[in-house]
Amino acid sequence: TFANAVYVYRYQQEQTHWCWAASAQMIGHTLGRQVTQTDIVTQVKGMDINDGANDTEMKNAVTYATLRNSVLRSSAWPFASATNELSTGEPFLIKLTWYKNGEPNGAHAVVASGYNTASGTLTVVDPWYGCGTKTFDYKSMITNCKFQSGTGKWTATIYV
């Protein structure tokens, strides 16, 4: 298959720092589990708080949202691995790191939902306000890419 898309219902993040909870919610919904962002945050953080998440907390969020063991890879996936995962019908979380003057300056979570091997692109669902689903060049995603919600690169992957 040269292209594949997994239907991922887009949930907008309900708080300014809940991109990770919204992304976990999208993955859970796609895999058949309905859970709220508040439930995810409370499960992971121990309270309902508008706070970002570290990599382990994002992994725990995906595990809770899907009721399946999730795996954290502290880097981008090779394109072939990303397409293999999506071809099984399973979206995955991408951690984007924003940079300013060459230094990390924040991060954001989005969900990969499709690919096209002919064009070398991945489709990404962004939970940030006013964003949606858009296709990006894989090579730019792992180096320096202008995403809908900021400019940075793919630095971690969480999948089930």
Regions found by a protein language model. Give the residues of each.
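Conserved active-site-adjacent core of cysteine acyl-enzyme catalytic domains
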Residues: 28, 39-160
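Active-site nucleophile-adjacent alpha helix/oxyanion-hole segment immediately C-terminal to the catalytic cysteine
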Residues: 2-49
